[in-house]
Amino acid sequence: MVEGRRRRRFSLSSQQLALLLLLLSFFLCFSVASPRAISDSDLLDETVANSSSSVASLNASSSSSLVKPKEGSFADIIDRALEKEFNESDQNEVADPGSFNNSVAGQQAVLETVARVKSTKKNETKEEKRFQLHDVFNLNNDNRAEDTPTLIDRKDNVFIISNSKSKYPVLQLDLRLISDLVVVIVSATCGGIAFACAGQPVITGYLLAGSIIGPGGLNFISEMVQVETVAQFGVVFLLFALGLEFSTAKLKVVRSVAVLGGLLQILLFMFLCGITVSLCGGKRSEGVFVGAFLSMSSTAVVLKFLMEKNSTNSLHGQVTIGILILQDCAVGLLFALLPVLEGNSGIVHGMLSIGKVVVLLLSFLAVLSILSRTCIPWLLKLMVSLSSQTNELYQLAAVAFCLLVAWCSDKLGLSLELGSFAAGVMISTTDLAEHTLEQIEPIRNLFAALFLASIGMLVNVHFLWTHVDILLASVILVIIIKTTIVTTVVKGFGYNNKTALLVGISLAQIGEFAFVLLSRASNLHLIEGKLYLLLLGTTALSLVTTPLVFKMIPAVVHLGILLKWFSPDSTIEKGEIVRSESGKQRMILMSRQSHSS
C-alpha cells in the first residue's frame, strides 16, 4: 500500500515536472521574442505534426496518472457502470468522411506547413502593454470560453477553425465573430443616428461606420469573411421584401424597358468599352469586361433609397427596380461569359454555357410559377391557422421559405438575389403579402444595415486618400457616362425627360456585386493588377458617394425645370404613365371615370 502511494506521488510529481518544463519553454520563447505581436514568419517554423505529437504525449501522461476511486465504493460502482455504458468506441474519435486522411486522398490536397495561433493570457507575458482603444474590442477576459484557434499558411492566409475535433460533443462558440457582429451593429446604429440627426440619409451613416471599423480604418473587425457572409442576408431580405411589394400589373407597364432596356444598356456598355479600349491599343476582352462591370448597379443601396423616399411605387421607381432585377438575372450570364473573354474556352463552349444558364433560368421561373398557384396559398393559410396565438411560426416559415428559394437559385448557378426576389413575388400573388411584409420588415432592416456596413468595411480609407485624385475623377466619369447611357435608353422607350433622368441618376453607380465579378476576373487573369486596383477603388468610392448623388436629385430636377427640359407640373406618379398609345388610352379612360363620378 505504501509502495502504491509512492508510485502515485512519483507519477504526480513527474506530471508537474512536465508541465513546469512546458511552461518554462513558453517563457523562454516569449522572453527571447520582441514585445510586439508574433509575426507569421516566426510561427511558421513550427509544424503541426510536432505540436500535435507533443500534445498527444502530454494527454497520454495525464490520463495515465488519473486517480481511480476505491474498489467497492459507491464511486467505483458508478465508474464501472459508466465504463460499461460508454465504451472505447464511443469515447475515441471516429474518422469521418471529412477527416484528414480522406480529405487528402479524395480531394488531391497538398500537405503544407501552417501555424496555429492562440491568444496569450495576461499572466503569461512579462511586460504590460499600454492601453489601446483597439484592446477594448479584443476578447481578453480570463473567465471566457476558449478562443477559436487560427491557422496561418505561408502566404499569410488566415483560416478560422470552423469545427474543432473533440472527444465529446461540446458547445462551440466563436467569440470573435460575436464580438465583430456587436461592433458592426453598434457602429451602424451610431452612424445612422448621427446622419439622421444631421438630416442626411442613414445609408451614408452605415457605409461610413463600416469604413471606420473595417481593415482600412481602425481595424476592429477580425473575421471579415464571417461578418460579410452573415451580412449577405441583408440583400436577401431586401429583395424578398421588394418581391412582396411587387405588382404584376405595374410590371406590365414597365416590362419592355425593364427587360429590353436593361439588356440594351448592358450590351451598350460592353460594346462601347470594347471599342474604346481597342482604339486605345488595349485588349478588347478587358474592355468588354469593364463594360459588363460598369453596367451593374447596386440593388441594395438603390432599393434602400427608394424605400426611404417612398418612391418604390412611382414610375421612375418601377423602371429602376425592373432594370435592377434584370441585372440580377443577368449575373449568371456574365459569369458564363468570363471564360470566353479569357480565351481558354472556345466561343462554342461559351455559347453553350450561356444557353444552359438561360434554360435553367426559364425552368426555375416556370416551376416557381406553378408552385405559387398551387402550393403556396395552401401553405400560407396553414401557417396562419397554426399561428393564431402568436405570429412566431408564420414569421419563421416566411424566413425559411425565402432562404430555401434563394438557396435553390444559387445551387442552380443563378443568384441569391434572384431567388429571394422570386420568393417574394410568389407570396405577393396571395392575400397575405402585406401580412408577410409586416412580419419580415424588422429582420430586413437589421440585416440591411449590417450589409451596408459590411460594404463600408471594403472601403480602404488610406487607399482612397492616397489615390483620391484619379479615383474621384473615375467616379465622376462613371456617373456621367452611366447617367447619359441609361437616360438615353429609357428615353428611347417613350418616357419623358424627367423619368429618364431620374432612372439614369438612380443607376449611376457600380454595384456591390461588382466586387465578386472583379475577383473572378482577377482569378482568371482577365485583367491586370493595375486595372484591378483602379476598378476596386472606383467601385468602393462610388458606393460611398451614391447617397450624396441621391441627395442632389431635387437640385437636378429644379435645374431641369429652369432649363425647360421638362415641365414643372409633371408628376412622377400619374402624368408620366402616358408614354405610348395604350398609356394614353388608359389615362383618358381614368379621367372620364373621374369626371362621371
Swiss-Prot record:
Chief localisation class: Golgi
Tissue expr: Expressed in roots, stems, leaves, flowers and silique.
Observed phenotype of the null mutant: No visible phenotype. The triple mutant kea4 kea5 kea6 is compromised in cell wall biosynthesis and has small rosettes, short seedlings, and is sensitive to low potassium K(+) availability and to high salinity (e.g. K(+), NaCl and LiCl); it also exhibits a reduced luminal pH in the Golgi, trans-Golgi network, prevacuolar compartment and vacuole. These phenotypes are partially suppressed by the cell wall-derived pectin homogalacturonan trigalacturonic GalA(3) in the dark but not in light conditions.
Keyword annotations from UniProtKB, A to Z: Antiport, Golgi apparatus, Ion transport, Membrane, Potassium, Potassium transport, Signal, Transmembrane, Transmembrane helix, Transport
Transmembrane segments annotated in the record for this chain: 177-197, 201-221, 224-244, 257-277, 287-307, 321-341, 351-371, 396-416, 440-460, 461-481, 499-519, 543-563
Topology with respect to the bilayer: Multi-pass membrane protein
Protein name as it appears in the record: K(+) efflux antiporter 6
Organism, as annotated: Arabidopsis thaliana
